[in-house]
Amino acid sequence: MHEEITGIILAGGRATRMGGEDKGLIQIAGIPLYQYVLSRLRPQVSLMAISANRNQARYGESGLPIVSDLTPDFSGPLAGMLAGLKHAATEWVVFVPCDVPDFPATLVDQLWQQKGSSLAAYASDGERAHPTLALLHTSLAPQLKEYLARGERKLMLFLDAAGARKIAFSGQQAAFHNLNTREDCLRWQQEKGLTNE
């Protein structure tokens, strides 16, 4: 477990493919999706928070701090990341989206061990980059704030500009599958053998 890293679950998106429903709160076997992500992250970091712009009371039932975007326009994962960097009391922050419940149990460890001297690192499955699963140093906050103020929204471009290191989790493509639709959620529930309470 990494005490020097705060873990932030990104749950602030619009969830257009879920019909605008708050993706992190979709129930799978009677448990909200974000709780599966939370239980995966909990052994990896000592401090956690949730980045959310809607239904904050429901996310607050987790007992974790809820962090709102500092920008009012739903400007994508980067806005949640900026809020997370400003919230954290630790120097480093790891981000995971609320819809990737199988992300590697070694995610934080590998990003931390392999970042080298970089101020940021993000996951790749060997074929595709997964920039929302990323480790960032809080000193990147001013640069990110400026980037968003210019109207920029592309996460990958920001990470490249920050000199982020890509960390490969080879052969773990399935670990990075995100649940975009209700059908995805149902399929995942069946794969895991989860039954409705």
Swiss-Prot record:
Q: Where in the cell is it found?
A: Cytoplasm
Which annotated residues bind GTP? L10, A11, G12, K23, D69, D99
Give the EC number.
2.7.7.77
Q: Which cofactor does it need?
A: Mg(2+)
Q: Which UniProt keywords apply?
A: Cytoplasm, GTP-binding, Magnesium, Metal-binding, Molybdenum cofactor biosynthesis, Nucleotide-binding, Transferase
Binding locations of Mg(2+): D99
Keyword Metal-binding assigned to the entry: answer is yes
Keyword Secreted annotated: no
UniProt GO BP: bis(molybdopterin guanine dinucleotide)molybdenum biosynthetic process
GO cellular-component term (any): cytoplasm
Q: What is known of its domains?
A: The N-terminal domain determines nucleotide recognition and specific binding, while the C-terminal domain determines the specific binding to the target protein.
Please state what the protein is called: Molybdenum cofactor guanylyltransferase
Which organism is this protein's natural source? Serratia proteamaculans (strain 568)
